[in-house]
C-alpha cells in the first residue's frame, strides 16, 4: 500500500517546538477541541497572520488499521476544493511520518447539538434560517458528488453569529456501509430506513432523511424517532410514523412528512424542498445563487499586500502560487485564510444577526464541555414518551436524575482485559453461540436462526480507552468473504474459557498499551478446533438479529 507521505511534501511538515508549544508548519497548536473518529482536533494559530484554525490530526496507524488510506487521499483532494459559507473549509494538509494534519476553518460557537441541549427548541423563524443554511451546504456537496451519510446536530457547528457550518462533510463517506452504526456513537436515530435495514442506497436520499430529523429537532427540541428498545426504535423508523406537536405550522409539517418519507423514491429531493412554500420564506439569495461559483477569480489587493508584509515576499511570488493553483504553498494558504476570514465577517454583517449572540450561547461552560460519547436515554415527559434533546445534556442529567442508557454498541469496564474476555467467553458459551478467535481480544461470533437456518454474525473487539478503562465493541458482520480470507482462526462451538487464560499478559504489558487514547489490544492467535467455516450467503438485513445478539450477550454479562 502506497504511503500517504508520497503525495505530500515533508520539508515543512516536521513538528517543532515554539516556546514550549507544538508547531506544525506555520501553525502553533493549542487546546484540544474534541476527539473524532481518526484522532484529535486542536485549535491552531497561524504564526504570521494570527488567524485561528482547527487542526484535525489523523493518526496514520489508525488510518491503516481501518483500511481507508486510498479513500482519505481522494476525499481530501476533493474537500480542498470546496468553498461554501456553511461548510467547514479545509485550508491545507500537512503530512508527517506519524500523522496527517488537516488545517480547517475554526468556529467558536460549538455544536448545534449542545445549543439545543442548553436552550431547547428554536422558534420557527430561527429554525428555518439554520435549516436553509444546512440544506444549502448539503446541496453544494451533492452537486459535487459528495454525500455526508452521517448528518446530525453534532456535525453542525455554529459560529459566533449563530450561522451553521457542516463539519466532516465527505470524511464520513470514507466509511464502509457496514460501519455506519459503529461510527455514529451507537445512535441510529438519524439513520434512514434503508440504512438500518441494510438495503442499497445511492446516497443523497439518506442525507435528506437526516436533514429532516435535524429540522424536527430544531423545531421541537426532540427526536422524531426514539425508543429505549432498539428493535422498537428500528420499527418506528421503518414505519415512518412520528408525533407532530400542535404548535407546528401545517406547512412545515407537510415538509417534514415529505422529507421523512420511508420510500426513498417518494422522499423529497433538494429541488422539492427548495420549492416548498415554507422553505422559500425569507430565503437569502446567496444560499442558492444562479451562478454556483462561491469564490472570486479576482485578486484581492489588500490580502495580497498583507501576505507580502507577513512573509516578506514579493507580489510576483504570491501571484505565481495563486495562478498556478498551488494550494499547498504557505503563501496561497495564508492568502485564502485572510480572504475567508474577511468574507465570513462581511457575510455575517450582510445576511445575519446584527447583534451579538446571547451570553448563554457563548459561555465558557458551553464552549468547553466535552463531546458526548453516546446519547443517554431520557425520562419521558408525556404519555407519548417524547425525549427532549435538552435532556441529552450530561451536565443537566446529573441534576435531573436522568437514568443511564440501557444499550449502546459497546460495554465499558475497568476490569483486567483477560478477565473481561473470560466473562465474554462464558456468556457466549451459555448462549450456545458459535465463535472463532482471531486473537485473544478479537472474536467473531455467529448464531443460527432456528426458523430460517441462517446465521447472524457479529464481532467482539476489546479496545483500550485509557490507562484504566476498556471498551468491548460490538459490530455486525455481513462480509463472509472477508471472514473466510482472514484464515487466522477457525470456528469453535462452546469452547473452553481456559483458551483465553492461556493468552494472558502481565499488567505491565497492558499498561504499556495505555499510551494511545484508543488502541486495539492484540496478541498471538489462538487456534482452536477446526470446524468448517460457513460461507452460505445470508439474505437481506440482519441488523435486528445483530442487536438481539447484543442484547442477549449484555443480559448475560450483567448477571
Curated annotation (Swiss-Prot):
SUPFAM superfamilies in the record: KA1-like, Protein kinase-like (PK-like)
GO CC entries: apical plasma membrane; axon; chromatin; ciliary basal body; cilium; cytoplasm; cytosol; dendrite
Free-text activity regulation comment from the record: Activated by phosphorylation on Thr-183. Binding of AMP to non-catalytic gamma subunit (PRKAG1, PRKAG2 or PRKAG3) results in allosteric activation, inducing phosphorylation on Thr-183. AMP-binding to gamma subunit also sustains activity by preventing dephosphorylation of Thr-183. ADP also stimulates Thr-183 phosphorylation, without stimulating already phosphorylated AMPK. ATP promotes dephosphorylation of Thr-183, rendering the enzyme inactive. Under physiological conditions AMPK mainly exists in its inactive form in complex with ATP, which is much more abundant than AMP.
SMART domains noted in UniProt: S_TKc (SM00220)
Biological processes annotated in GO: autophagy; CAMKK-AMPK signaling cascade; cellular response to calcium ion; cellular response to ethanol; cellular response to glucose starvation; cellular response to glucose stimulus; cellular response to hydrogen peroxide; cellular response to hypoxia
PTM remark: Ubiquitinated.
Major subcellular location class: cytoplasm
Composition bias, Low complexity: 516-535
Residue numbers spanned by region AIS: 302-381
Subcellular location as annotated: Cytoplasm; Nucleus
Reported function: Catalytic subunit of AMP-activated protein kinase (AMPK), an energy sensor protein kinase that plays a key role in regulating cellular energy metabolism. In response to reduction of intracellular ATP levels, AMPK activates energy-producing pathways and inhibits energy-consuming processes: inhibits protein, carbohydrate and lipid biosynthesis, as well as cell growth and proliferation. AMPK acts via direct phosphorylation of metabolic enzymes, and by longer-term effects via phosphorylation of transcription regulators.
Protein name per UniProt: 5'-AMP-activated protein kinase catalytic subunit alpha-1
Gene: PRKAA1
Amino acid at each position: 500500500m502506497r504511503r500517504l507521505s508520497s503525495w505530500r511534501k515533508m520539508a515543512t511538515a516536521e513538528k517543532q517546538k515554539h516556546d514550549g508549544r507544538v508547531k506544525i508548519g506555520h501553525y502553533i497548536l493549542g487546546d484540544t477541541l474534541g476527539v473524532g473518529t481518526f484522532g484529535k482536533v486542536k485549535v491552531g494559530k497561524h504564526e504570521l497572520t494570527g488567524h485561528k484554525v482547527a487542526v484535525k490530526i489523523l493518526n496514520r496507524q489508525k488510518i491503516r488499521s481501518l483500511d481507508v488510506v486510498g479513500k482519505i487521499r481522494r476525499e481530501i483532494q476533493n474537500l480542498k476544493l470546496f468553498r461554501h459559507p456553511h461548510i467547514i473549509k479545509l485550508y491545507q494538509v500537512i503530512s508527517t511520518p506519524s500523522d496527517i494534519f488537516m488545517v480547517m476553518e475554526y468556529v467558536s460557537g460549538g455544536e448545534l447539538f449542545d445549543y439545543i441541549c442548553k436552550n431547547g427548541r428554536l422558534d420557527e423563524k430561527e429554525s428555518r434560517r439554520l435549516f436553509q443554511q444546512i440544506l444549502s451546504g448539503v446541496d453544494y456537496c451533492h452537486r459535487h458528488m459528495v454525500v455526508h451519510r452521517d448528518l446530525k446536530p453534532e456535525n453542525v457547528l455554529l459560529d459566533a453569529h449563530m450561522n451553521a457550518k457542516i463539519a466532516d462533510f465527505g470524511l464520513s463517506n470514507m466509511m464502509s456501509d457496514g460501519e455506519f452504526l459503529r461510527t455514529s456513537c451507537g445512535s441510529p436515530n438519524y439513520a434512514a430506513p434503508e440504512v438500518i435495514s441494510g438495503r442499497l442506497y445511492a446516497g443523497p436520499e439518506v442525507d435528506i432523511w437526516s436533514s429532516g430529523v435535524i429540522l424536527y429537532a430544531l423545531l421541537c427540541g426532540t427526536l422524531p424517532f426514539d425508543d429505549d428498545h432498539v428493535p422498537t426504535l428500528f420499527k418506528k423508523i421503518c414505519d415512518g410514523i412520528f408525533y407532530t406537536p400542535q404548535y407546528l405550522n401545517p406547512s412545515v409539517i407537510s415538509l417534514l412528512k415529505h422529507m421523512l418519507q420511508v420510500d426513498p423514491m417518494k422522499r423529497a429531493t433538494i429541488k422539492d424542498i427548495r420549492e416548498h412554500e415554507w422553505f422559500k420564506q425569507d430565503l437569502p439569495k446567496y444560499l442558492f445563487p444562479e451562478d454556483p461559483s462561491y469564490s472570486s477569480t479576482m485578486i484581492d489587493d489588500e490580502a495580497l499586500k498583507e501576505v507580502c508584509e507577513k512573509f516578506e515576499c514579493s507580489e510576483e511570488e504570491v501571484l505565481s502560487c495563486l495562478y498556478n493553483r498551488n494550494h499547498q504553498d504557505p503563501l496561497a494558504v495564508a492568502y485564502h485564510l485572510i480572504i475567508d476570514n474577511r468574507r465570513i465577517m462581511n457575510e455575517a454583517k450582510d445576511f445575519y444577526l446584527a447583534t451579538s449572540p446571547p451570553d448563554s450561547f457563548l459561555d465558557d461552560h458551553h464552549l468547553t464541555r466535552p463531546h458526548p460519547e453516546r446519547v443517554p436515554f431520557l425520562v419521558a415527559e408525556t404519555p407519548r414518551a417524547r425525549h427532549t434533546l435538552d435532556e441529552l445534556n450530561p451536565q443537566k442529567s446529573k441534576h435531573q436524575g436522568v437514568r443511564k442508557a440501557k444499550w449502546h454498541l459497546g460495554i465499558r469496564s475497568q476490569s483486567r482485559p483477560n478477565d473481561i474476555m473470560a466473562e465474554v467467553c462464558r456468556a457466549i458459551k451459555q448462549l450456545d453461540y458459535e465463535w472463532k478467535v482471531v486473537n485473544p481480544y478479537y472474536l467473531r461470533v455467529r448464531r443460527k436462526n432456528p426458523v430460517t437456518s441462517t446465521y447472524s454474525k457479529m464481532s467482539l473487539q476489546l479496545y483500550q480507552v485509557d490507562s484504566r478503562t476498556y471498551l468491548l465493541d460490538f459490530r455486525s458482520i455481513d462480509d463472509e468473504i472477508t471472514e473466510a480470507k482472514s484464515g487466522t482462526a477457525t470456528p469453535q462451538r462452546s469452547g473452553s474459557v481456559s483458551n483465553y487464560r492461556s493468552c494472558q499478559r502481565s499488567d505491565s504489558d497492558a499498561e504499556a498499551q495505555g499510551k494511545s487514547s484508543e488502541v486495539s489490544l492484540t496478541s498471538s492467535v489462538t487456534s482452536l478446533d477446526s470446524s468448517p467455516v460457513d460461507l452460505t450467503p445470508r439474505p437481506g438485513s440482519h441488523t435486528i438479529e445483530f442487536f438481539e445478539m447484543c442484547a442477549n450477550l449484555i443480559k448475560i454479562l450483567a448477571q
